[in-house]
Amino acid sequence: MSASPISPPRQDWARLVGESIKQHGVWHTYSKLLEARRAYPDDLSLRGYVEILRNNIVKELLAHPKGVNAVPKLSAEFLTNFDRFNLSAQEGYLISLIDGRMDISKLMILSPFDPFTTLFNLAKLQQERAITIPQ
């Protein structure tokens, strides 16, 4: 008698992601999907939803009235308590480029990262309140 391997239950990511976005917003859903990726590292549909959310986050950043011409500034909270922020190397590099005069399009040119990664990291810094993008 051979035992067939029991596959783990398949998640309904479409429903879970949709409900989470409605109830908690994009950033909370993104962090929960990152946690789920650690639990289900081989789930390709989960990876797809992570990328869809990353795209939505960048779209929200670019929906700013000034778009890529907006000038990010370091927040007062970051300047007074910067060690509270657990920045990645990419985020730290982008922070070092922000001088309050350079717009996002110039940051994308100066950044060694691809434009999407640069925009996503700027959106993440804005979400964490390390930078502000005035209207």
Regions found by a protein language model. Name each.
Residues 1-60, 83-135:
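Long, charge-rich, low-complexity alpha-helical segments
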Residues 63-92:
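Short alpha-helical segments that sit at the start of domains
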